[in-house]
Design a protein with these regions (language model features):
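Active-site recognition of the HExxH zinc-binding catalytic motif
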Residues: 78-91, 112
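Contiguous, non-catalytic segments that form substrate-binding/exosite surfaces or channel walls
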Residues: 1-71
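C-terminal catalytic core of tyrosine-transesterase DNA break-rejoin enzymes
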Residues: 108-111, 115
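Short pre-active-site segment immediately N-terminal to the catalytic Zn-binding motif
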Residues: 63-79, 102-107
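Extended, non-globular alpha-helical segments
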Residues: 35-60, 77, 143-169
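Long, well-structured alpha-helical subdomains associated
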Residues: 103-104, 117-173
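Short helix-capping and hinge/turn segments at secondary-structure transitions, especially at repeat
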Residues: 38, 42, 72, 85-94, ...
Length: 173
């Protein structure tokens, strides 16, 4: 094959991504996310995922996030934003009040990834190709998202809350 390493994620979806970062300080961005999770009582657990290509997951029953220690630095930041979005929009308290059409995996993954894209992009993390592919796969090109307006309204609120909280965390460091 004549494929270059940067093409691997397109060819092999489970290969590691090294997203472009045009911001000033990826460590500071990561630290602001960790501070946000701490201030909102969302424990972050880091462990190697031996039999899974997953980058991380949010567990509503424990209101915690687990990240794969095999992630690249930029994957870790992106995944943490994605999982924090789940924690914000899909925790047990919020899920019980949602319409059934909003409480299904395709919608929840769409919302979390859209939030991760919006927040990451705001801070200079370019996940566009990955995010489009991820959303397309989960939603069958949005066919599985019935209420697009309500879904995006929640994404907007979660993106604003997370972005503004991160700014506050950065300013307080």
């Amino acid at each position: 094959t004549h494929a270059k390493p940067e093409d691997y994620p397109d060819i092999f979806p489970n290969k590691k991504n090294q997203f472009d970062f045009g911001g000033k300080d990826l460590d500071l961005l990561n630290q602001s996310l960790l501070e946000y999770s701490n201030s909102t009582n969302i424990p972050i657990i880091k462990e190697p995922f031996r039999d899974s290509a997953a980058k991380g997951y949010y567990m509503p029953s424990t209101h915690s996030i687990t990240l794969n220690t095999k992630n690249t630095e930029t994957e870790n930041v992106h995944t943490l934003i994605h999982e924090l979005a789940h924690a914000e929009m899909h925790n047990n308290n919020k899920l019980k009040d949602k319409e059934l059409s909003m409480n299904v995996p395709p919608v929840m993954e769409y919302q979390a990834e859209m939030t991760a894209y919006v927040v990451g992009n705001y801070y200079g993390l370019d996940t566009e190709k990955h995010s489009l592919r991820y959303i397309s796969n989960w939603t069958n090109n949005l066919e599985k998202v019935e209420d697009k307006i309500s879904s995006l309204s929640e994404v907007k609120k979660a993106s604003e809350k997370l972005s503004l909280s991160m700014v506050d965390e950065i300013l307080n460091m």
